[in-house]
């Protein structure tokens, strides 16, 4: 996956975000994407090759691994980041649409007095108001939903956030109940708890930003003359 391209796109959204939104994006890239790309892959490595069972029965090890780890932690985190980042792309599309409309009006001469040239339209910060407010607020709401949903899926799928050292498996074609050992369980548990904690921080930041936008919206409406 090209994380650099994603950073470029979200960096454009960050320009029009609130201060809390900028903090969220910093946490997303430094504490999640960078950790995932640089450190987590080294810790997990070839998970299936390091998963050892005390049997020589062909296929038993693969079946047991698939039973206890239906989706790799790395792939699940990558999928989570894609879902969490997608709502921000909607904001980027909305901002691009607004700029396109302003360019069209500028070329027609409808708003020539507001801008010197088209380059000024490209660099102007778009205010979060009107229909963009709804798009931006909706994107934050869906980010919270996706974060919470993936945390729940993670907890249910792996039966908690800690990595077991030993798992017992009796799935076919294993001849009986066999013992399987997970490599570096403590290190993996630390990374898992860290990633879950950062997800919780992101949820807190998103909820805080959502409350801030709602309060600002309500206070703005109350100031308008009846």
Curated annotation (Swiss-Prot):
The keyword Disulfide bond applies. One of its GO terms (molecular function) is calcium ion binding. It is a multi-pass membrane protein. Signal peptide: none annotated. Residues 41-73, 157-189 are extracellular. The keyword Ion transport does not apply. SMART domains: CNX (SM00037), Connexin_CCC (SM01089). Ca(2+) binds at residues 42, 45, 47. Its main location: membrane. It is found in: Cell membrane; Cell junction, Gap junction. InterPro entries: Connexin, Connexin26, Connexin_CCC, Connexin_CS, Connexin_N, Connexin_N_sf. Pfam families: Connexin (PF00029). Belongs to the connexin family. Beta-type (group I) subfamily. This is Gap junction beta-2 protein. It comes from Pongo pygmaeus.
């Amino acid at each position: 996956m090209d994380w650099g391209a994603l950073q470029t796109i979200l960096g454009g959204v960050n320009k029009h975000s609130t201060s809390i939104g900028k903090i969220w994006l910093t946490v997303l890239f430094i504490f999640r994407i960078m950790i995932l790309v640089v450190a987590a892959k080294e810790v997990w490595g070839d998970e299936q090759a390091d998963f050892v069972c005390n049997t020589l029965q062909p296929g038993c090890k693969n079946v047991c691994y698939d039973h206890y780890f239906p989706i790799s932690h790395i792939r699940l985190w990558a999928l989570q980041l894609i879902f969490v980042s997608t709502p921000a792309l909607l904001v980027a599309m909305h901002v691009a649409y607004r700029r396109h409309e302003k360019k069209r009006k500028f070329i027609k001469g409808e708003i020539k007095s507001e801008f010197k040239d088209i380059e000024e339209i490209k660099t102007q910060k778009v205010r979060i108001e009107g229909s963009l407010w709804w798009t931006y607020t909706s994107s934050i709401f869906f980010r919270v939903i996706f974060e919470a949903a993936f945390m729940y899926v993670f907890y249910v799928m792996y039966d908690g956030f800690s990595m077991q050292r030993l798992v017992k498996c009796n799935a076919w074609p294993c001849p009986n109940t066999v013992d399987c050992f997970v490599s570096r369980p403590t290190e993996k548990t630390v990374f898992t708890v860290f990633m879950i904690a950062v997800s919780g921080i992101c949820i807190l930041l998103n909820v805080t930003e959502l409350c801030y936008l709602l309060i600002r919206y309500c206070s703005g409406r109350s100031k308008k003359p009846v």
